[in-house]
Amino acid sequence: MITAIINARIKSERLKEKHLYKIGHKTIFEHIIDNLLNTSLINEIYLATGPRNNNYKYEKFFKSKYKNKIKLFYYNNEFDVTGRVFNLTKKIRNKYTLLVSGDCPLIDKGFIIRLYNLIKLNPSKSFILPPKKIIHEGIKIFKTDAWQNV
């Protein structure tokens, strides 16, 4: 199974609170989460964000919209994305983790399945990168324990 991490913070530099903006009738977060929930390989979803006092609005949104389906991970350093993901992976028990950029609403179930199959077929690899630039550039899969080597 796969744990998905959505990486986002409310105070992004160019467009604050962009994850709560709507595309059609859904917010960017809703597009991402609905597609992740529709992928049977994913059994756990985290939002990895900065300090709670800066990002509490996300917690309110997720509790009202998704009840207990999304776990929140707060990390005190707003700008240390690597540290945020590293520390969160210590809590994850699944063998594989999917890292999703919070401003990437183009989540495709078929693409996730292909990434998962690629990493399973290549047991010596810790992560899989697509061979060329694609529209899903905000999505990466890796072995969760690979972060212990960082």
Language model feature labels by segment:
Residues M1-K16:
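N-terminal nucleotide-binding beta1-loop-alpha1 segment
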Residues T97-L98:
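Short aromatic/hydrophobic "clamp" motif used to bind/position activated sugar donors
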